[in-house]
Regions:
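Extracytoplasmic "Venus flytrap"/periplasmic binding protein-like
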Residues: 1-10, 46-47, 151, 158-159, ...
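Short, solvent-exposed loop/beta-turn-alpha elements that line the ligand-binding surface or hinge
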Residues: 2-10, 54-58, 98-119, 192
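Extracytoplasmic/periplasmic solute-binding protein
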Residues: 18-37, 45, 62-110, 116
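Aromatic-glycine-rich donor-binding/catalytic loop that engages nucleotide-sugar donors
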Residues: 42-56
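Short helices/loops that flank or line small-molecule/ion binding pockets
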Residues: 44, 65-72, 143-160
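Glycine-centered hinge/linker elements that transmit conformational signals in sensory
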Residues: 67-70, 105-142
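Glycine-rich, aromatic-lined ligand/substrate-binding cores of catalytic
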Residues: 117-129, 147-166, 170
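Extracytoplasmic/periplasmic substrate-recognition and gating elements
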Residues: 177-192
Length: 192
């Protein structure tokens, strides 16, 4: 593939991420965010929170704002947990902007001691310590209701980190997140 041709211009940067030495090993054809934080706008409003999409537009959607919402929302006695799903750890780790293992000048680099990775890990530790994550370990390692998104439409879950693929289906399969036709379901980039 000649990456200098116009067909490949938009994806050259992404394709270059898969180089080792001077060789490409993957040709990227499309990029999508691996994770977004899905939320229910009605739940945000009912709890008096600013809309995360608006916070993002204003440059105020970050780890601190996200953490404050999670800590405030969570009430285990009422079965309210800020986070549910399988992907929040990966999403937050990747939002540090530093891969655990990277490539610099064509060589593998271990970034485990990078300060941004430590910051992301400490944030996740604090979230877990404060029980903001639905306790799958107490529920036979199943999601709430044993299905993705359960708890969003009922106001029991604040954020559901997942790929956009979860919302790209028919309304009958996205009902767990809320009523799409009423504009209840929204997503925001993973905070950083």
């Amino acid at each position: 593939i000649d990456l200098s041709k116009p067909l490949w211009t938009d994806i050259k940067g992404a394709t270059d991420q898969f180089m080792l030495g001077d060789k490409h090993y993957v040709s990227v054809i499309r990029t999508d965010p691996a994770y977004v934080f899905v939320y229910n706008k009605q739940t945000m409003e009912d709890n008096g929170y600013d809309d995360p999409a608006e916070l993002f537009k204003e440059g105020k959607w970050n780890w601190d704002t996200f953490t404050e919402m999670c800590l405030d929302f969570t009430d285990a006695e009422s079965d309210k947990y800020a986070l549910d799903g399988w992907y929040y750890e990966k999403a937050l780790q990747q939002s540090s902007g530093v891969p655990l293992i990277g490539i610099t000048d064509g060589k593998l680099v271990n970034n485990i001691s990078d300060p941004m990775i430590a910051k992301a890990q400490n944030m996740m530790y604090e979230l877990q310590k404060n029980n903001v994550v639905y306790p799958k370990h107490e529920n036979n390692w199943k999601l709430r209701g044993d299905a993705e998104g359960i708890g969003m439409a009922t106001g029991l879950t604040l954020f559901y980190p997942i790929g956009l693929w979860a919302l790209e289906n028919a309304p009958s399969t996205t009902v767990n997140y809320g009523d799409v036709s009423k504009g209840e379901v929204m997503f925001v980039p993973v905070p950083c």
